[in-house]
Amino acid sequence: MKKNYSWLLFLLLSPLVVSAQPLEQDASFLTGKLENGLTYYIRHNAKEPGIADFYIAQRVGSILEEPRQRGLAHFLEHMAFNGTTNFRGDGKSPGIVPWCESVGVKFGANLNAYTSVDQTVYNISAVPVRRKAVLDSALLILHDWSHNLLLTDKEIDKERGVIHEEWRTRRAGKATQRMMERVLPVVYRGTKYEDCLPIGSMDIVDNFPYKDLRDYYKKWYRPDLQAVIVVGDIDPAEVEAKIKRLFGSIPRPKHAAERVYYPVTDNDRMIVATDRDSEQPIMLANLYMKHNVVPDGEKSNVGYLRDNYIESLIISMLNARLQEVQQQAVPPFLSATAHAGRFLVSRTKDAFWLSFGCRQENVKGSFDAAIAESERARRYGFTEGELQRAQDRQLKVAERQYAERNDRRNRYFVNKALQHFLSAEPVVTETLQLELIRQFNRTVTPEQVNRAAKRLISDKNQVLVVYAPDKPEFKLPPNDTLEQYVLNAQAATYAPYSEPQLAGELIPQLPQPGTIVGERTGAYGTKVLELSNGTTVYVKPTDFSKDQITMRLWGEGGTSRYPDSDAPNFPFVASAITDAGVGTFDKNTLRKMLSSKIAGVTPSISDDTQQLSGKSSVKDLKTMLELTYLYFDQPRRDTVAFNGAIDRMRSFLTNREANPQVSYNDSLVAILYGNHPRMQPTKRETLDRVSYDRVWQIYRESFADASKFKMLLVGNVDIDSLRPLLCQYVATLPSSKNNTATAEPTSRKKYPTPDVRNADETHLFKKRMNTPSALVNIFYTFEEPYTPKSDLALDVLQRVLQTAYTDSVREEKGGTYGVSVGYALEKDNRPTAMLRISFRTDPAKYETLIPIVYRQVAHIADRGPNPVSMDKVKKYLLKTYGQNIIDNGYWDYVIYHRLQDGIDFHTDYEQLVRNLTAGDVQQMAKDLLGSHRRIEVTMLSE
């Protein structure tokens, strides 16, 4: 039934609008609450046929732990996968992970959970539910998670090591994580948030009594704090009946503990919390201005969405100003962004804040410049032009959401339900959302926005958090000095913001259109159009996303056409162009001109190709093609923008090697490629060898002759509307075919790109680390034909290995948070395959774990893959194939690789998966070991 929103339009246009006017909630959700307090959300969604997502959310997190339980909320989340009443994993009944993977639901990708300060959420996603037994079992898992975890002594002890390794993974190489742990007691002094991060205390994790975990589970996992969410290709009434029958019998505990949401105190004087870490490369500052949150009971009204709308306008406009400042020849800060939302980790306090990277040689200047823009906005507000652009952008986003309202994947609707249950966010339809935005655009005045900016951006209730390098050469100003930087900047005098009037057209003078000289039907249902300048256009019309079109325009060439001596310039060829803007417009002006458009184009250059890639809405296809024309034929040269980017990069790279992970990655690349000049990292000293003239020349030569380019468009494209646009913006690109090519490469010679060295080696080195770790990478390379079958066999091999390592290295040994296995198959130079195995662990364990890694590979080469594991992988691949073929990105990938590499990854893919044998995978493992090309690189903490 078509809903009539005229009542809302009348109310919004009326001067007597009441902010408390209730919102109509999205009726497509079937919602309810059982007698025991459990909430449920159910929604049918046919976008993914035969697929559904199952979630259970808890209004429970690490903030509820008692001191002796620090880390147990997160620990309990892990234990949910290690045995329940109906999924024991003891041989009598399957465990949750094995059962899920038996139906194509992959652990990690589809089966997962997270714990935060105030919530814990579990998911079983992308479940094939055409069989009712599968749907019933997925609900049964949610039921068991809610109150039927086994929590056996043995499984608890096994998981301690896994948690410890997760702690190591999260902290190692992540200085901001460590510093955040240390500043929270200062920021939240006297509140429960002083020590509340979910990872907890490793001393407790390693030693807590079993009873403490069971007590936490019994106290907090209960139906009045839980919600079941099911979205997908299901019958909502049937699922509702099942939920009532299955979950209704769960008892609501008597004398249940109160779920307290702990307050955050306000402060008269600024709180300054600073911390230093030897692995932190740059100084980061976050200036918070705390505000009260909107009570949950006041969020289901028009006024709440209106306030959010105004707030988002303010943040958008302020960030645009900060980006302008960043484009200066010598930017006063490395980066700066404005935000509004939750204050750090607390649900009970909101904030506006500025985040900015400081120049270490001029910390005060960075503070001054960032705060100047927030103060300018607070005092003088925003211009009518700024406001109009921000409102246009809001409307464009709402229009796209409306256009694609029937194209949403399950997760979109799951997130709506999660936000409603966990944060009381209103659930409204895209139709109502669009109508609200239209009315807000008409009724919200500049004066209202500027008054809101004064309330949001304050000089009261402030908190300054600074993360800085711990280096002798960097002198961090004392806390009172940093506080004074803020106060002085907030008291300084500023002029109002002003901007020049924008031009009307991206391309003021259009060239004479070209023509389409031929049309035919191509592979995969594409329409192939030959243009008069020699460019070939492939169009794949789809209706998967009603308001999306993807584009790529590419040609052969790339950096392999240039000598090794140009290698320092390669990383800047594309970025120098985007930093400069395009045509007659600098980057800031271009951003403003595109504010009401959903269209963008980005240049890139790889070893063998140069490319322009973009996305647009259906209405803004013309704009995307205009940008394509400009980036190809009229890139903009801007020395000021280039020098500013190099200057920022130089500051970013000052302490580059402070992070051990950076040093490790540098060593990996050097070892693998023998210090090849094309594989050198960009360091501070490298910047001295970068030439803007040469960067510009490489770009112009790369995009000089469109006759050698192909274009691919995928999405909701109307061919008849497209033809004149192609004639105007693509057929007019410079081309040797019509003698308009703008340049010729200095050399047609193709320089060899580096391969991984042919070696069988083991490397070990040490590096000082703040979190003791061993990082291990093992690379196998071998010659392998580049075919769909070899790609599939290698994919299955890496997935089977991933499962084996999860079982043996993570679960049995508790030796790592996870072993990552990846592969690559290349056809250039010579057809080569690579398999990479990597993990992080305790330095005391790496010598025990590495042999296990090798044994698993040898086992598959000797005996073949585990048949159960291989069957699970094939089911997962077939399921994801069904999901992929209704996605524009999939078709872009498939068609591009057919055109560029001559490889058909689509035709008969399902049959290829079904026909792949254990022998095929075993042979791949044999080839891998038989090549004797293995490089192992381990970095240990000193």
Specify the residue positions occupied by each region the protein language model found.
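Bacterial Sec-dependent N-terminal signal peptides
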Residues: M1-P22
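Proteolytic maturation boundary segments
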Residues: A20-I42, D235-Q323, Q327-A329, Q388-D392, ...
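M16 family metallopeptidases and their MPP-like homologs
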Residues: Y41-R43, E48-E65, G71-A73, G91-D144, ...
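Active-site His/Glu-centered metal-binding helix of metallohydrolases
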Residues: L72-A80, I314, V573
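Metal-associated gating/positioning segment near the N- to mid-region
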Residues: M79-G91
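Hydrophobic, small-residue-rich alpha-helical packing segments that form membrane-like cores
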Residues: R160-D212, Y216-P223, I229-V231, P236-I243, ...
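Internal metal/ion-chelating core segments
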Residues: I204-I243, P681, R689-Y729
